[in-house]
A protein has these predicted regions:
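Generic low-polarity alpha-helical segments
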Residues: 1-16, 64, 96-97, 106-110, ...
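Alpha-helical and coiled-coil interaction segments, frequently adjacent to or embedded
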Residues: 10-18, 37, 83, 118-172
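Intrinsic-disorder/low-complexity loop/linker signature
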Residues: 22-23, 33, 84, 103, ...
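Phosphate/dinucleotide-binding and metal-coordinating scaffold of catalytic cores
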Residues: 48, 79, 158-159
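Hydrophobic/aromatic-rich core segments of domains that either
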Residues: 55-137
Length: 173
């Protein structure tokens, strides 16, 4: 699919990284992420050519929308409730998008560079199951709820984004 390949090439311009609350750039590291990360606007992502999975998936969503390709954004993570406050804990979250063309579902993966590519599935359920199983295996089999989300508001901390995802309910366990 040429359109999806074009989107993947556009995403290749974006490095995996984030800008902290002090304006410092962090590339390929999650050190102090829970303490000083805030979500960026799409304008900042495009201008600075940097973003983590949340921003990259939101950019993918916008690009797919511009092409009138139906799509959804999802988050797989180890559940953390509103009282979780371990700012040194490892992040167990990954956002991904699915798009729907003809009778197939496609997953454009860019943020996880080891899995970079375009994946084709016969259904949304198959796609979510396989993607989630990959991340559950990385977390030694720990269950990860998957939740559809609709926006990546600018300025959210990691905890705020997690609480936003929690507020949407679970799609699948």
């Amino acid at each position: 699919m040429k359109e999806l390949e074009d989107i993947l090439r556009k995403l290749d311009e974006i490095k995996y990284g984030w800008i902290d609350i002090n304006g410092e750039v962090h590339l390929n590291t999650m050190k102090d992420f829970r303490k000083i990360y805030k979500t960026m606007s799409i304008e900042t992502v495009l201008d600075r050519k940097i973003g983590i999975c949340m921003e990259q998936v939101f950019l993918t969503h916008i690009l797919l929308d511009q092409l009138d390709i139906p799509n959804k954004m999802f988050c797989t993570r180890i559940y953390e409730d509103e009282n979780f406050n371990d700012l040194d804990a490892h992040e167990h979250m990954h956002c991904f998008s699915l798009c729907y063309i003809g009778d197939f579902v496609y997953h454009i993966e860019h943020a996880n560079q080891e899995e970079r590519g375009i994946y084709k599935y016969s259904s949304e359920e198959e796609a979510i199951s396989k993607i989630n199983a990959f991340y559950e295996a990385l977390d030694k089999g720990r269950a990860r709820p998957v939740t559809e989300f609709f926006d990546v508001p600018e300025g959210l901390t990691f905890k705020d984004f997690n609480l936003y995802i929690n507020s949407l309910g679970e799609y699948n366990k």
